């Protein structure tokens, strides 16, 4: 297993992973969709153009997972992390996250920051096992046109549509 920074030559191999990540992310909001490889390729190119470190795990010439970091000064954000279904529960996400934490330490930081959907139990549990248990910020916005909410989320004394 090899972990390295992705380059443009990895576009064909990483695009299906990015596309599937987007499908699974939409499922958290109850939206059914299909993988869109062309959009995934475009997203990958945008990451590279923005100089976001894209960490990938490769085994036997197949990409099994990736983590996109956004660096803002000395702060590292995990923009997205995804491991192919067949490779899950094998430590790949932990290895990717360790690399992101190494980037943060190299910049003088002590943590990687994360935006997560409040019903994304998989990533919340994963992060909790790594010691990430502090709620920092919440994103609050106006509803989109025709948006359907499936639940209410409580944060402190406040309730929000989700």
Q: Where are the regions that the model predicts?
A:
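Conserved GNAT-fold acetyl-CoA-binding loop/helix
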Residues: 2, 22-43
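A short helix-loop-beta-strand connector motif used in the catalytic cores of GNAT acetyltransferases and
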Residues: 42-56, 77
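Conserved beta-strand in the GNAT
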Residues: 56, 62-70, 77-82
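Glycine-rich acetyl-CoA-binding "A-motif" of GNAT/NAT acetyltransferases
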Residues: 62-65, 122, 134
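Conserved GNAT acetyl-CoA-binding A-motif
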Residues: 104-116
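Conserved beta-strand-loop-alpha-helix junction that forms the acyl-donor binding cleft
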Residues: 114-123, 145
